[in-house]
A protein has these predicted regions:
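Hydrophobic membrane-insertion alpha-helices, especially the h-region
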Residues: 37-52
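Membrane-embedded alpha-helical segments of integral membrane proteins
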Residues: 1-27
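Hydrophobic alpha-helical segments of integral membrane proteins
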Residues: 1-5, 54, 58-62, 243-250
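Membrane-interface helix-boundary motifs at transmembrane edges
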Residues: 27-35
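A structural signal for short, hydrophobic/glycine-enriched beta-strand patches
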Residues: 48-235, 239
């Protein structure tokens, strides 16, 4: 039910709903003015959210909360404080295709691919570290964590250096199941930059100590090209991601998860 409501509140359904309601009022009722207002608001909102100059700024309100991790700076800070180096890297899954006939690298989504590659990069920079890959099976027969581990092995990560957390179904489950592996030790948390604020709040609620390592920040294109100011699917996708995260934050707050 939560996912259905989330999909219905995404920018495209909301805008189309406003336009549709406005047209119905215009065609079949005497409330012409209200119909014009609803249809106009829906059209203007859809147009604005489809422009990357607008939707990009919205998603940056999430992504700007955590900067990319500087590993060398982190190591220096830990050494100067007399603390042991971080040895665990938690990678949050970001979805899979669900098509088992595809090779593992093609089964994972763009978000999962970015997160996993960042986790592997950190793993190589931190000798002796361990990758903790998250993600249950959901409707698929094979868990997300298992597929991520297969891709990681193809990139040279040793199977013995990975731990699979295969019970979580969504973001709210990750802290509960990951806590069994990290206990009270600091760890690197890898997820998409727009997703990091919600993930950090959820892990903090479990009294865990994540060190954020966000990946996939949206950047303003150099030179402000024409397409940056025109409506398009890419802009609408950014608005959808931002809306999903803000709805997720609101839901988590209402449920007392953050």
């Amino acid at each position: 039910m939560k996912k259905i409501v989330g999909e219905m509140l995404a920018p495209l359904p909301v805008c189309l709903g406003l336009i549709g309601a406005g047209l119905l009022l215009l065609w079949f009722t005497r409330k012409k003015f209200l119909g014009k207002v609803l249809a106009s608001v829906g059209f203007v909102l859809l147009t604005l959210l489809s422009i990357q100059a607008v939707s990009g700024r919205i998603i940056q309100t999430l992504e700007s909360q955590y900067k990319p991790l500087d590993v060398s700076h982190l190591q220096t800070r830990l050494e100067s404080a007399g603390e042991p180096p971080v040895s665990q890297i938690v990678v949050l899954a970001g979805g899979i295709s669900g098509d088992p006939t595809l090779p593992p690298p093609l089964q994972i989504s763009k978000a999962s691919r970015e997160r996993l590659l960042e986790g592997i990069r950190l793993y190589r920079l931190l000798p002796g570290s361990q990758l903790i890959l998250t993600g249950g099976s959901g409707l698929q027969s094979v868990s997300e964590a298992t597929i991520l581990s297969r891709v990681a092995q193809s990139h040279g990560v040793k199977k013995s250096d990975m731990v699979l957390e295969v019970q979580s179904r969504d973001t709210k489950d990750h802290p509960r199941f990951v806590s069994a592996f990290v206990k009270d030790q600091p760890f690197l948390l890898v997820t998409s930059a727009y997703h990091m604020p919600r993930a950090m709040k959820l892990f903090a609620k479990y009294n865990l100590f994540p060190i954020p390592s966000p990946i996939g920040h949206w950047r303003v294109p150099e030179g402000f090209p024409l397409w940056y100011w025109l409506p398009g699917a890419s802009g609408l996708r950014l608005a959808e991601l931002a809306t999903h995260e803000y709805l997720g934050l609101a839901w988590a707050w209402l449920q007392g998860q953050i």
